[in-house]
UniProtKB/Swiss-Prot annotation:
It comes from the Bacteria. It holds the Pfam family BPD_transp_2. This is Fructose import permease protein FrcC. Keywords: Cell inner membrane, Cell membrane, Membrane, Sugar transport, Transmembrane, Transmembrane helix, Transport. GO terms for molecular function: transmembrane transporter activity. It is found in: Cell inner membrane. It comes from Rhizobium meliloti. Coiled coil: none annotated. The gene is frcC. Belongs to the binding-protein-dependent transport system permease family. The keyword Hydrolase does not apply. InterPro entries: ABC_transp_permease (IPR001851). The lineage of its organism: Bacteria, Pseudomonadati, Pseudomonadota, Alphaproteobacteria, Hyphomicrobiales.
């Protein structure tokens, strides 16, 4: 009995101490964030907010200045048609830039793919549908080569894609002999090549299938990037590749898949380009690489990787389209468009640097 009482005594003392102890939970001083800090955090968590705000404000501004001439179904759909190609190529560029890379070859891959589609049909007599598949395959192959050089040989994306840009551009001119395939010939013998240039009406609005594929592509990639493991890996690789590797992500395979998909999307843009201009021209789309980077940067996607929304890229492309058409309707010198777009690019990068302080 004495041993039992001795054993129970420490237990009773522990219960007494526990009963007398404070039940307050440890707390830290709460510092209210300033309005500026709240804004900073909001923009960090919603990267597409800034381009959306700029887009809405620019629409309102040109609407007030131009009135009904700007706010018409025809004008709004014309803006969409103008940015369809940039939006598709911008989607390809977005994937690469999210990994902290850059692809200067997107425009050249787009044009080469369109030339392959045209030349295989009219030079070799391939069925147009098979020529389209071959063009898509060439685009994916170019992207695969880019990805392999970046991921396996550890070469800088800027250097790799700069070299690929020159190689593909030269190959394009050498292979096509700078020959343009006329729109009339395509329409008569291979109308599928012009498919994305066909249009349909909804009320007074005229849409092309190129616009439809751009919107569907952006929505699909938004879902993939935000709702799938592959999409999360894209952001992880761009944010910190070493941490992603430690977390079990195969960074090499991811980079190759991203660049390959980017090349495939560029080839899709090449198909849409034929529909847009009607013909197959080796000189078309010369500035697509710069225009795609512009849409991505204005769209709030960080050039340092790991942050941004593909919806922001679409808003960025629309901002460029709104400014271009709005200033043209005002009768201003076209150089003002480039000046304002240049300012927007610098401001967008400055805002990105400011927002990145939150993560730091």
């Amino acid at each position: 009995m004495g041993e039992t009482n001795t054993a129970a005594q420490p237990s009773q003392e522990f219960e007494k101490v526990l009963a007398d102890s404070s039940t307050d939970v440890a707390s830290f001083d709460a510092h209210d964030k300033t309005l500026l800090q709240k804004l900073q955090h909001f923009l960090h968590s919603s990267p597409a907010a800034v381009p959306l705000i700029v887009l809405v404000l620019s629409l309102i501004a040109f609407g007030v200045i131009l009135g009904g001439k700007f706010f018409s179904a025809f004008t709004m759909t014309l803006i969409l048609q103008q940015v369809a190609i940039v939006g598709i190529v911008g989607a390809a560029q977005t994937l690469v830039i999210l990994t902290a890379g850059i692809d200067l070859s997107v425009g050249a891959i787009m044009v080469l793919s369109s030339v392959i589609m045209g030349q295989f049909t009219f030079r070799y007599g391939f069925p147009p549908a098979l020529s389209v598949i071959c063009g898509l395959g060439v685009g994916a192959l170019c992207g695969y080569i880019n990805g392999t050089l970046v991921a396996r040989m550890k070469l800088p994306p800027f250097i790799v894609t700069l070299g690929m840009w020159q190689i593909v551009l030269a190959s394009n001119f050498l292979y096509s002999a700078n020959e343009t395939i006329r729109a009339q010939d395509i329409s008569a013998n291979a109308s599928i090549l012009q498919f994305f240039g066909q249009n349909f009406r909804i009320g007074n609005a005229v849409f092309t299938y190129g616009v439809v594929v751009m919107v569907l592509l952006v929505c699909l990639l938004w879902y993939v990037l935000n709702r799938t493991a592959w999409g999360r890996y894209v952001y992880a690789v761009g944010d910190d590749p070493e941490a992603a590797k430690l977390a079990g992500v195969n960074v090499t395979r991811m980079l190759i898949s991203i660049y390959t998909l980017s090349g495939l999307i560029c080839a899709l843009a090449g198909w849409a380009l034929i529909g847009r201009i009607g013909s197959v021209s080796p000189t078309a789309g010369q500035f697509a690489n710069i225009e795609s980077i512009t849409a991505v940067v204005i769209g709030g996607i960080s050039l340092f990787g790991g942050r941004g929304s593909i919806m922001g890229m679409l808003f960025g492309a629309l901002i460029v389209g709104v400014f271009s058409l709005g200033l043209r309707l005002m009768g201003t010198d076209p150089q003002w468009t480039y000046l304002l777009i240049g300012l927007l690019i610098i401001i967008a990068v400055a805002i990105d640097q400011w927002i990145r302080k939150v993560a730091a």
